[in-house]
């Protein structure tokens, strides 16, 4: 099973709490995380793109770096680990995105891939006059399908004359082509999102669910399997999990409860309001992000416990059919990656190939 890190491109990582570590994103922080992850044999890094945060006392995600340029920088200071940026497709035309990808492919010598998002938080785009209207919610995967088609053409052939509803190419040329096998990721969990992944993506990301329930996401894999049965493609799931680890279960749980006690209610309320804006689907992952149950960390799957129990639960993740890997976030990223590499990974049956 592959293991990657969802690096903290935004302030405070993925904990919306006054009691969690408070920090700003920086290249130096992410460089240290990237190099430690590579040294411990982890497989990939992914950075998101967030253009406006949730506010509140913690100003959650109000401070963010940009995904492509951050990953270009990290490509120059790493040697083996795979790198994925996230593309805000409402802002960046597909031909320009293809050229940026080709450039980072050159910097990284074939280690780069791209995560495509449609955009769901209206204020991110309306603040700069780029929100296409709420009808976007119903048509966003139609748009993204054209986007992905153009990317594939440009990467494979170096040119495209695709004529669609959303994009029109006229003898568009993007060269040199990438030296690596450019992989596409999508994180959509709605029926439309999974149908898109089944047709265009190489990997599909999903949110884990619950606290210490490492296989609770299995239903998402089953839904994707039904979608890929129609396309005949092999698309594996990578599941997002937060790890809060300590020497003992009690110590780890104390940290988790402390973070929960400090939840930034104002920021969580903003998330809830934005998550309710899409009226077209009940299966979108934004519904899970904004649910009240564990909004302190956007309701992602959370593994809390001793190093031994975290290792056991991560191995359980790998037992879910069609799971290709896990994408990890930590309460403290530098310490978390180091602890994972030295105390957790050596205990995992699915990571024994990294030993020594």
UniProtKB/Swiss-Prot annotation:
InterPro entries: Luciferase-like_dom, Luciferase-like_sf, Pyrimidine_monooxygenase_RutA, SsuD_RutA_monooxygenase
EC number: 1.14.99.46
Coiled-coil stretches noted in the UniProt entry, renumbered to this chain: none
GO process annotations (BP): alkanesulfonate catabolic process; nitrogen utilization; uracil catabolic process
NCBIfam families hit by this protein: RutA
Family classification: Belongs to the NtaA/SnaA/DszA monooxygenase family. RutA subfamily.
Protein name in UniProt: Pyrimidine monooxygenase RutA
Organism: Haliangium ochraceum (strain DSM 14365 / JCM 11303 / SMP-2)
Taxon lineage: Bacteria, Pseudomonadati, Myxococcota, Polyangia, Haliangiales
